[in-house]
Amino acid sequence: MEGNRDEAEKCVEIAREALNAGNREKAQRFLQKAEKLYPLPSARALLEIIMKNGSTAGNSPHCRKPSGGGDQSKPNCTKDSSSGSGESGKGYTKDQVDGVLSINKCKNYYEVLGVTKDAGDEDLKKAYRKLALKFHPDKNHAPGATDAFKKIGNAYAVLSNPEKRKQYDLTGNEEQACNQQNNGRFNFHRGCEADITPEDLFNIFFGGGFPSGSVHSFSNGRAGYSNQHQHRHSGHEREEERGDGGFSVFIQLMPIIVLILVSLLSQLMVSNPPYSLYPRSGSGQTIKMQTENLGVIYYVNKDFKNEYKGMLLQKVEKSVEEDYVTNIRNNCWKERQQKTDMQYAAKVYHDERLRRKAEALSMDNCKELERLTSIYKGG
């Protein structure tokens, strides 16, 4: 299954790139593929957010790259256009600093999002969209903006999930401990353990990043996401899509292939015994022999006498007698069962003819078993 895990992680990475590019449908398709290959918690968390909030992605106004070929250092904004000295200068305003300080001072998730404890899904989405755009590190360069952005994502992730929200309401203020232990990552099923990054959550809501075309750095526990350019070759993705059908068929056929291989190996490893209790012309076991102890008849091929002598012959004859006694014992049990059934039927139906027939059964195997038993006892 580890091979499937690697393929699933590749699918998750492709899904993340699709989210950065604003292609939610492609992201959802590759996350579903990852789910089939291996149950990664990160894939499940991303897929749940897309299914729950996918319809809102890209609907809120925020910065986008201009479609033309002009100056790409100036974002085409429809909201929050007054941002101090602008992104190109990496400056920030006093309002941005005050906002970051205000978020980082909040003691619980409800304060972070600025909602009441009975806030519904729409209230949470509205609050998250507003704050995520305002504090995204590609837009807000004030000191502490990254931590504030993580805090906002963590708050929405917990409060938007009914189970997490219920747990959070019961345990009280654990937000600070979560941030210290997991550096801002969050999980929908296992406490504060991370499975989805704030950037992934943002991309699910807004269908892509800011005009810088970069992924801001979030170092968090098991994974670190560095600043990197998003111009990627799509050849591998197309190859993944084309190869999906063949790989799925291979996975489905794997159990059958394994069974066939095991069957072939077992046949190769198990050799035929050098004797038979009955003559078998197909294997050449037609030469009649008799065991020294019980006088059991068995059949061998023409090379047997040359290959089995002394101790080897004694072992073979012991196996012959054990097989013979086992067969006689089983056949005797069948004879007794048949006789008992006939006697019972004769009694129920008052059938004298059937009773006489039951009494007349020869019981040859049982007689042979008695003979063998007397020999064993030295009689």
Curated annotation (Swiss-Prot):
A Gene Ontology BP annotation from the UniProt entry: cellular response to misfolded protein
InterPro entries per the UniProt record, alphabetical: DnaJ_domain, DnaJ_domain_CS, DnaJ_subfamily_B/C, DUF1977_DnaJ-like, J_dom_sf
Stated name of the protein: DnaJ homolog subfamily B member 14
Subcellular location: Endoplasmic reticulum membrane; Nucleus membrane
Disordered, as annotated region: 55-94, 221-241
Membrane topology of the entry: Single-pass membrane protein
Family per similarity comment: Belongs to the DnaJ family. DNAJB12/DNAJB14 subfamily.
